[in-house]
Amino acid sequence: MGLSEMGGPAGRPRVVGFIPARMAASRFPGKPLHPILGVPMLEHVIRRAAMYEHWDYLTLATCDGEIRAFAEGIGFPCVMTGDHHVRALDRVAEAYELVASSDLLGGGPNDDDVVVCVQGDEPMMRPDMVDAVVAPLLADTGIPATVLAMHIVDEDLWRNPDTVKLISNQAGEVLYTSRAPIPHGREGFSEDLMARRIYGIFAF
């Protein structure tokens, strides 16, 4: 798909996607390449993310040679970043600068670009989830960033500190996030709490 000088097709901002992944996950080392139904988890994410129809560019972002070799084996782009990043979004930020400064996008970094992070451990993601975080940014340039949130209907997930919950106001603006079980009702968990968790898809 060709890019115009103004950005993406028909002059819209470019939509640039990154799938950050690393082998040294503290809770599950080697998780990105762990097989699910005989296919590495990361490949499930790639296949599903690629179904979104409006990418101007989509690539892996990693510091691991093993993941780069996997990407080369399936013919998928991969950007090598530093190994010092603690957060996936920091890796994505570096990867974007590398991609935007290369000939891959043409025209260099652009403040109008919409940068999307699809976490490499979300094998059940769907292309409409990408649209859910991208569409608000395309519609309103005053929105700085978006994150996908999912309702929690399971008490164990609500109590799990590995699950990041969020609280937002009525306008949908995130007020704060926590690994604690929030919001917390007087009688503990119930679906009426409308607790929500962060799903690993972000855009900014």
Regions found by a protein language model. Give the residues of each.
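N-terminal glycine-rich phosphate-binding loop and ensuing alpha1 helix
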Residues: 3-62
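Hydrophobic/aromatic residues located in beta-strands of well-ordered beta-sheets
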Residues: 17, 58-60, 115, 145-146, ...
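Short beta-strand segments
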Residues: 20, 117-119, 148-149
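Active-site donor-binding loop signature of nucleotide-sugar glycosyltransferases
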Residues: 38, 81-83, 120, 168, ...
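Short phosphate-binding loop-to-helix
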Residues: 51, 59, 65-135
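Short, high-confidence coil segments that cap the C-terminus of an alpha-helix
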Residues: 55, 110-112, 140-143
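Conserved core of the sugar-phosphate nucleotidyltransferase
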Residues: 125-203
